[in-house]
Amino acid sequence: ETPHQGTALFHLPGLFEFYDLYALFLPLYRAHREYFYDWCAIGSIYGAPSDCLWAGGRVEYSDRTPREVLALTREYGISARLTLSNSLLRPEHLTDPDCNALCRLFQEQNDPQNGAIVHAELLTQYLKKNYPSLYLVSSTTKVLTNFNDLQRELARPEFRYVVPDFRLNRAFDRLAALPQSQKDKVEFLCNECCWFGCTERRACYEAVSRKNLGLPGPEHYCSAPGAADGYRFSRAMANPGFIGIRAIRDTYLPRGFTQFKIEGRGLGSALILEFLLHYLTKPEYQLAVREELYLDTMLDLF
């Protein structure tokens, strides 16, 4: 008998970028629920179109339209979140017609309710005023590494969820002391591959914000050990801040935490599938999921 209590809700990456993967995976998830853990579910899928001025965090490439992705998430009763986490927005950017049309669409098609992940205070207040039906998530791009800063953010009523920096994932003594109303708002970033000692995380995110706005500025080059190898799930698993399936079931759920974010925008869809297998799929059914999605007798890898 597992010691979990409650349901773990996963927030998955690539709303636009990995549309084709989710279009195959979600029907399987519905038709064969026995393949997947009964104590977890998909809470949302997050992302932004390629040309979204307000976007941040990572650059996402896709030719899928907002109406297409919303049709998919609505069909499966999953919340869609826009990653509007650009940290460098100025007042003149708030009038962008494409971003406003995007928010209107996500607000109108709100069954289930859709949300937005935000960084800039300017945009937070703008969305709260103009698109009040979108729930707001405080972005991990704020790099909240100080627990007092996290507590202040959790106390803000405008945010339904707050994603702290992954280096607070194991601050168990202070996390356990939070009231349940604030525990319900903490959304842990589970599979970060970034170096635990990184001091350039904010600069990394700002470089993406500049690109989306078309602003000049230095390119960010990651100086972390092993950066040249790119993202590796095995390295993420060795990260002191990593939260795997056992930790969720045995440590976080029993302590009253239920929200878990999986990163992955900008990666390949094969890696995203590995995340779906690790976090959602019972080990004895992982091969069956692979066979349903891509693995057949004609597939050559080499």
Regions found by a protein language model. Give the residues of each.
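Active-site pocket-lining/capping segments in soluble small-molecule metabolic enzymes
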Residues: 1-149, 153, 159-302
